[in-house]
Amino acid sequence: MAIKIAQTNVDEVYSKIVEPNLYTNTWLIPGVTCTDKYTEKAGGVYVHKIVSGGKKAPTAPGQDFTNEDAADTLIPILYNNAYNYSTKIYNAQAAAVGYDAAEAHLRDNVEKTRESAQASALACLYTEGTALAETTKATADNAKELLINARKEISKKKGTANVVLCSPDFYATVLMAAGKEFTPETNERIVTTGQVGRWLGMTFFEVNDFSNGDAVYRDSSGTAKTVSSANLALVDFVMYDARVLSYIQLLNMMRLKDSELFNGVLAQTELVAGFKVTTAECAAVKKHTA
């Protein structure tokens, strides 16, 4: 339908600028929230873990050694999570629009691949981490106590924690809780940026994967494990040591490929990765009752 101003038909144009889509926050960052130190060129990686007998009571001096047999266990991390996207763009389509269609679709596929891998990492933490017995609903008044208690539970098992992944609801609660405490530099940053950053000795991330549908990953046995959106919605936070979430990549490809079957290009991405919580005692999952 033509647009008129008074009695004159006026021109209509399509913008050359593409409105960006919305994607989940980036939080899966090697060296910050996970580790990729076990990456190898293979179909899977098996990590040795020494069986430790623990501490001993002292004896009187002048005793013979008591030998223990060396033993270890294996932690499997398999490259069995593959994500691939392919979008067909006809040259006739690309020539008829003012924006770079191939680049735009490739960028979209890159973001969707990232989102998919992050959802899998979250499912891995949920499934292989340790659920806390505490199920109290978080509020601004008790958020700090819940966090300290979770850290305490990890510490009792000889572990440490330096990362907290928060649901959007809990992150908002933390903003209110942290804002109540007068720490000038920290308080000012929270007010101006809306980001907690570091608090209580840990780095906080708002993770909207908690509220964006089911999360699926394939575990080290090759079994697809699904965490439903309903179960994710009950999670307040996951607290863990970044060194115990392994995220290894065998292949991470993106390309624009000319096709021999049609006049155009394919915008393609593929990621092959593996996920593992190598020490469950250092990953605490805080849920609340429905």
Each model region followed by its residue ranges:
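Generic, well-ordered alpha-helical segments
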Residues: 39, 57, 69-71, 79-81, ...
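Structured, hydrophobic secondary-structure cores that serve as assembly/anchoring elements
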Residues: 52, 65-66, 73-96, 145-181
